Amino acid sequence: LNSIEELAYSLASRISGLKVITLPEHGNTWKGIIRNIRFAQKHQGDINHIFSPEIAYISLFLKGNVILTWHDTGTLLQSSSFLKRFIRKWFWFILPNRFAKHITCISQYTANEIKQITPRVKNKISIVYNPYNEVIHFHPKEFRKENPHILHIGTGMRKNLLRTIKALRNIPCTLIIVGILKQEHIEQLKKNHIQYKNYLDIPF
């Protein structure tokens, strides 16, 4: 398995009563945050495992035990606004980590980042490395000169999809996008005349 998300979907098919819930809103608008909190409260379980740091705030509103998994701290604390940095630090990092029953990090580097931001939680952090999936093998393939396929994994803000779309504007190719497309992505794909295919939760 290559990611915690893939592990979750794999376990859900094998363990009775285990459900994978995808929140309805992406991004951090107040409307989206409130909708996500209500959705999470409605679908919460006895144990709630939160995979994404971008939604760590929902842990503050759940009654069951919470496990937080941190891949990295990303750009959550990067903002020119002191108020935004303050809100994100407390409601995306400090309070969620304190309320969580346990915290997992995918590397020692990430664990050190979390300990630096929230020193109090250092004793409930475990490191669980992302595993390598043995079904993945390298297969040499001749480059497709006419209409090459370009793979883009992830649609989050840090994945830079919008700039990728603009960069490919005059290049005849097919953009293969793995992840949930937002309306702004679709609009830019049309505006820049990009031929594309979109996939979600691709099994091996």
Features from the language model and the residues they span:
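Carbohydrate transferase catalytic cores enriched for Leloir-type hexosyltransferases
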Residues: 1-204
